[in-house]
């Protein structure tokens, strides 16, 4: 897990569409999170710093502030909670903060750090789901100690997409970050497919990157594959509202199919998940459709390479298990989820899964398969 320190925690960007009255109330609640988030940034980016006893009081104080201010969102008017997925997102993050804070106070700092890595995931997941009305810039809220990659992650999480693209492009031109080209390129594609959604503009940008001839051969081949996907997207007809789930499923299935080079179609997977998100946001799905949609998101994100949607697969797979226990989709979701977690904690010395995470896996397994399928407790 120590190699996954690029994600930075921030919740500022959970906003509602501008069409909803009094959106300023939600934004005002989010403003309270700025100070504790900025303080925690370098600590959440470095597990050693987070677990250092010298930082314990500081972390405790900021977690208390985050929990208090985020729980205030649970008291917003019903009209906000009626938005598809919003109340669920608030509840998930509130529970995450409660759990991480409790474990941290118990001295289980590594587990608390691991749990808090989900914060930026949940944040950008909301951006991918809801219609964010605008972008903005608030450079003062970025810690000076962050390197360009960490800075870009924070900018993406706080919906400062224009600045994020500039930061990522600059890092791509810097030879000292050549080892991170795959992360940078995937972050750029993520912005293009999930935020900008202009395949012609994206084609021009990535063709320009290829022309620079700075990319390693493997990365250049990856971008070449994206160009094909973007080209197909630019020629695809608009998808009707009622067909988004079905079209999204087709794209996900096609994107997950490995070709002769064993590569998934990243553009198709990202397009497909965008359509599934939109179908969930629109509402009107019956239980079977919603169950399929949530599972498809978890499955699709598990098929995407690392640094695209780190943690998104766990988010939706776990949601599928929690909302639809003892169903076929829940069982599929658990199998993917458990494999992912085991991979995260397996290295050259074997597997070393923390006890708390093992208990969490066991809880999910019982929900996915049903208590009756397990031996009774002694």
What kind of region is each of these model predictions?
Residues 44, 104, 128, 156, ...:
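Specific register positions within alpha-helical solenoid repeats of the TPR/Sel1-like families, i.e.
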Residues 121-124, 157-169, 198-202, 263-277, ...:
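Helix-turn-helix repeat elements of alpha-solenoid scaffolds
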Residues 245-313:
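Alpha-helical adaptor scaffolds
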Residues 143-150, 190-206, 227-244, 302-306, ...:
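Alpha-helical linker/edge segments of TPR/alpha-solenoid repeat scaffolds
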Residues 20-118, 132-232:
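Extracytoplasmic c-type cytochrome modules immediately beyond a signal peptide or single-pass transmembrane anchor
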Residues 119-131:
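The canonical Cys-X-X-Cys-His
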Residues 80, 126-129, 171-181, 209-236, ...:
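Short solvent-exposed coil/turn linkers within tandem alpha-helical repeat scaffolds
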Residues 61, 88-90, 142, 179, ...:
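Residue signature of alpha-solenoid helical repeat architecture, marking inter-repeat boundaries
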């Amino acid at each position: 897990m120590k190699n996954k320190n690029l994600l930075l925690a921030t919740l500022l960007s959970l906003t509602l569409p501008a069409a909803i009255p009094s959106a300023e109330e939600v934004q005002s609640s989010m403003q309270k999170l700025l100070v504790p988030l900025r303080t925690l940034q370098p600590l959440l980016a470095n597990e050693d710093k987070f677990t250092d006893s010298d930082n314990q009081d500081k972390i405790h104080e900021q977690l208390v502030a985050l929990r208090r201010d985020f729980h205030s969102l649970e008291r917003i008017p019903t009209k906000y909670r009626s938005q598809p997925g919003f109340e669920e997102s608030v509840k998930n993050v509130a529970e995450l903060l409660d759990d991480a804070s409790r474990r941290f106070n118990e001295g289980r700092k590594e587990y608390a750090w691991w749990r808090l890595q989900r914060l930026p995931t949940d944040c950008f997941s909301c951006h991918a789901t809801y219609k964010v009305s605008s972008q903005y810039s608030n450079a003062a809220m970025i810690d000076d100690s962050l390197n360009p990659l960490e800075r870009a992650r924070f900018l993406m999480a706080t919906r400062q997409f224009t600045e994020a693209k500039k930061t990522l492009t600059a890092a791509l031109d810097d030879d000292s970050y050549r080892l991170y080209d795959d992360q940078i390129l995937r972050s750029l594609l993520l912005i293009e497919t999930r935020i900008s959604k202009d395949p012609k503009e994206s084609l021009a940008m990535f063709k320009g990157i290829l022309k620079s001839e700075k990319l390693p051969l493997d990365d250049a081949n990856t971008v070449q594959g994206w160009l094909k996907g973007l080209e197909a997207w630019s020629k695809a007809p608009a998808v009707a509202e009622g067909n988004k789930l079905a079209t999204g499923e087709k794209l996900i299935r096609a994107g997950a199919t490995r070709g002769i080079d064993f590569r998934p179609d990243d553009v198709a997977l990202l397009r497909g998940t965008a359509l599934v998100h939109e179908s969930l946001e629109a509402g009107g799905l019956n239980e079977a459709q919603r169950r399929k949609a949530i599972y498809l998101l978890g499955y699709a994100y598990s098929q995407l390479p690392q640094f695209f949607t780190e943690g998104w697969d766990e988010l939706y797979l776990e949601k599928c298990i929690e909302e639809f226990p003892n169903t076929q989709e829940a069982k599929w979701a658990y199998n993917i989820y458990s494999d992912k977690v085991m991979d995260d904690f397996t290295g050259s010395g074997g597997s070393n899964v923390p006890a708390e995470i093992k208990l969490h896996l066991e809880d999910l397994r019982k929900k996915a398969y049903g208590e009756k399928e397990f031996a009774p407790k002694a």
